[in-house]
A protein has these predicted regions:
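Structured, active/binding-site neighborhoods that engage oxygen-rich ligands
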Residues: 1-331
Length: 331
């Protein structure tokens, strides 16, 4: 196995777990007041001042679409934190699925998209499989389509959100563990995997870019050079050089949105990866502190910085996923 791909996966998990308590904070004053510097894993607290769960609704059309289970009780209530029952150092649902994907690939000894969708459906329909309150719209839409009788391969929606990338580092790490190092093969598999749920050109293209950047790191190409060469459509090197001189909240919050929508969420992620190309800790902390969809940006920020710099043991000691990643236990 290649350290770069394995560390990229771990970096994405660390970045998500660090961001988790301030996920979808848009009022940065409230973020600072509630959580301070965010230089270590912290537990979430209610109330969440920017939570929109009070106006979120999901009514499964039948039992096949029931993926909220006991958490449905909290939907429609004000101030509920999206991840209220997670512990400090624990990952959000999309990254718990990423961990499951990684273990599933290794324990099976291979990857098959149809069989993965069957496993995805099984775990999401299992009450208590996870303890996260919020389930993203892409999952709700997928299971609505599935409950209507559509085949799993035909349940994807056109979803242009950076959450599409949350499983990419895990998928690459799993394939790498099985000896699938060819960049072209990795890119094709990753794009097809993302399209299973987020079948939108922006999501698929962003996934392809992340694969290319990680493969460049594996070939010894410096991160900034790779971004400058590969990410021209998303942002130019001259702009990145300008932005690295500015406060992060001026860049991500004013120049580009902190929200989940592509392409701006990818541009924001590339800013952090560029600016903090020599400092993993500062990069994931800066990403967390601007709020918004920091958890899903962590697939890019934590993934690229973890891949190029590695992840220190200090972050891994308190990362709950380290136990979940063990492959000596059955799925």
């Amino acid at each position: 196995m290649k350290d770069i791909f394995q560390n990229a996966f771990l970096g994405s998990l660390v970045g998500d777990a660090l961001s988790m308590p301030v996920h979808w904070y848009y009022d940065t004053s409230a973020l600072d007041r509630d959580y301070g510097a965010i230089d270590c894993y912290l537990p979430p607290r209610n109330p969440h001042p920017d939570s929109i769960l009070w106006r979120s609704r999901y009514h499964p059309i039948n039992e096949l679409a029931d993926i909220l289970h006991d958490q449905a009780y909290f939907w429609g209530q004000k101030g509920v934190h999206y991840h209220q029952f997670l512990e400090a150092g624990e990952n959000t649902l999309n990254y718990q699925l990423a961990i499951e994907l990684y273990r599933w690939i290794i324990l099976r000894g291979g990857y098959n998209s149809r069989e993965w969708l069957e496993h995805y459906i099984e775990v999401m329909q299992t009450s208590g499989w996870h303890d996260d309150t919020y389930v993203e719209e892409v999952h709700r839409n997928f299971f609505t389509q599935y409950a209507r009788g559509n085949k799993p391969m035909n349940c994807a929606v056109k979803d242009p959100h950076i959450g599409a990338l949350s499983q990419v580092p895990a998928l690459i790490a799993g394939l790498d563990a099985l000896g699938v190092p060819n960049p072209d093969d990795l890119t094709e598999i990753v794009k097809s995997h993302v399209a299973l749920t987020h079948n939108h050109p922006e999501s698929i293209e962003a996934a392809g870019l992340l694969v290319q950047l990680l493969c460049d790191l594996d070939e010894g190409i410096p991160l900034r050079q790779s971004i400058a060469n590969r990410a021209v459509k998303w942002i130019g090197a001259s702009t990145l050089k300008d932005w690295e001189q500015r406060p992060d909240r001026e860049v991500v919050g004013r120049k580009v949105s902190t929200a989940c929508y592509l392409p701006e969420s990818m541009t924001a992620s590339l800013h952090f990866a560029w600016k903090y190309a020599q400092d993993f800790d500062k990069g994931i902390q800066a990403n967390a502190r601007v709020g918004g969809d920091n958890c899903h940006r962590a697939a890019v920020v934590g993934g690229l910085l973890g891949g190029t710099l590695g992840v220190s043991a200090d972050w891994l000691l308190e990362l709950k996923a380290m136990e979940a990643l063990r492959c000596d236990k059955p799925l």
